[in-house]
């Protein structure tokens, strides 16, 4: 939940201090990181997903994109890869599987005028920043959850929607459910540590890269893993409450019902978009998006900016190139919050020797 209370910074030793926190590591967030570096701002990025790229990576990595200036055409994932390469010289930290939960004003250390912001994530990470730039696309992505009555009590222990630590699956019987790139990639990776991996999908075809599908079929043929066509029917457990453990998974298909012995279920059915906690940050919103001033792309709450699809204003165009423009202007205003006593010198990558050296010899 959000708060309007001005507060002293607790547990400073456990808090990351930087100039700007970028919420969202999709194309706009990645370009924003590059722009921050060009301006001399320190920044860190967080994303609710387990890797950079946002919708381009998670929903349509193979989709052709034709409206990026000077790029006649490229695949969505190729664009993400190029943006990662572009911002790599600045080596800004990226924190994945992190959802921005709350923001609070922090008492300034010195001048008593330019207050800073404390952002806390769902895992407890905290960031003490001069400004926040929200580049969260259509909102925070949340996993499509298993709709079986037994699932909620097992989530986080035996039912998972992301793989955050491969070692926890060592020696386990793992069922990976899904038919996209993430499901195939993790099934293939987990087969190297798990006692047995079964990939479960409702049909023979996949929405995944041909190479991954071929590798999976070869692994099945070699006896390294299993592939079952069907849908989740029930989760059978032992124990109760927090001591409940997954024992078996009931699979339903046209051929009937079968039961798989399983210790862990990794359900990778894709993502759904939701506004998330950001909608409760006491900013003016329009249809789930952040209303911004188009001269600075700052929200109604001082120090919080928005760029990309999450930003709302009259005649807003939901284009990646629009997000690039919005982020560039937002960071110029954010610079004044980070360095209130300094004037921003207009920087061009072509005529700044130090910057040019950094970008060409990274």
Swiss-Prot record:
Cofactor: FAD
Classification via Pfam families: Pyr_redox_2
An annotated Gene Ontology molecular function: flavin adenine dinucleotide binding
EC numbers for this chain: 1.18.1.2
Positions that bind FAD: 47, 55, 60, 100, 141, 309, 350
Lineage top rank: taxon: Bacteria
Cofactor remark: Binds 1 FAD per subunit.
Record key words, sorted: FAD, Flavoprotein, NADP, Oxidoreductase
Catalytic reactions of this protein: 2 reduced [2Fe-2S]-[ferredoxin] + NADP(+) + H(+) = 2 oxidized [2Fe-2S]-[ferredoxin] + NADPH
Family per record: Belongs to the ferredoxin--NADP reductase type 2 family.
HAMAP family: FENR2 (MF_01685)
Assembly: Homodimer.
Protein name as annotated: Ferredoxin--NADP reductase 1
Organism: Cupriavidus pinatubonensis (strain JMP 134 / LMG 1197)
